Amino acid sequence: MNRLPASRLLFAALSLASAPSLLAQTSGPIAPQPGTAIQQPPRDAKIGVSVSLVNTPITVRDNKGNMIHTLDAKDFQITDNGVPQRVLHFDMGGDPLSLVVLVETSSRVATFLPQISKAGILITQTVMGANGEAGIIGFNDAVDKLQGFTHNADKIESVFDHLQTGGSGTKLYDAMTAGIEMLSSQPQPTSDQPGRRRVMLIIAEATDIGSGTQFGEALRHAQLANVTIYSVGLSTTRAQLQAEPRDTTPQVTPPGTFGTPPMPGTVQTPDTEAARLGSGDLGQAIIWAVKHAKDKVKGNPLELAAAGTGGAHLATFKDRSIETAIDQIGGELHAQYSVSYAPTGTNADGYHEIKVSLAKSATKGVKDSKDWKIRNRPGYYVGPPES
């Protein structure tokens, strides 16, 4: 077991994510000796970032929820901040996966442990796929690498069979950062070389207790590293009781004014305030989180992380078990499209909105195609935090 320091990781993940050309020359950063903390740069250091490759998963479903499998690269239109982009790589479920599984092992989820232990065989049989590999990180009061990347199904299943709970902390955001660092060392597919899709699967409560990392920092780096996040939410009573409630207080200030001061360097609007308070549109909350990466974000972090990277969040409730959720995630991963492009014609800094649409020729003569639903990652943010 390798214990991962609570500091670290963000700069390593960011530099690898934003320079895919380097990945062809090296297998990744030199691993530190066990127990050696990675040196952190100053907190106020400015980060210079250039994004040379963007990947987005694309899921297309009809009005009954069935996935559409008949589309090709020419059927998709991609824009980055409104500027059309040229597709460099297109795939439909064929690129092998590099998967990092984050498993909460706090005492808070002890009652779920028998169900979580059964997840290993599902991950190897339905999620990894042919030529897939997986690594496992457990987290509670600490973040531990339980298994490095391996193709060996027996090793992965053994880790799940021997999971044990620890303290009551849930360092979710630190664990996300550690997982992003692992995935950032894996080569991405381009137009002229094969690569791997970077996927993170989180099995946890929608709660963070004790992380040194903020949610927005982890999400921003996941986006820049082209990591797609799927999450299986463990619905514990304690998690629901400790979750920060949405702001539902009545408006007592005059119209056009706000009851609290603005965040430094920002202009207050109804949308920005709703995103900050966790009561607004999911898309606005994602944008707010990556723009204000060092500030706390309200709302369900598992849902925000999945939506912010093009993945999906499945809560365990009623008749949906952990096994059912993982099975659904595996089915989607191996039937979705993946598109890569090199951003051109847009400003480097700031938030980049990714939009995906279908060419008219793709749906010509197809009944009910106007009701098809497209899901992709909404964008990414380049530049230092605004606050």
Predicted segments, located by residue:
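Scaffold/interface architecture of coatomer-like assemblies
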Residues: 23-387
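N-terminal secretory signal peptides that target proteins for export/translocation
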Residues: 1-6
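Bacterial N-terminal signal peptides
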Residues: 11-21
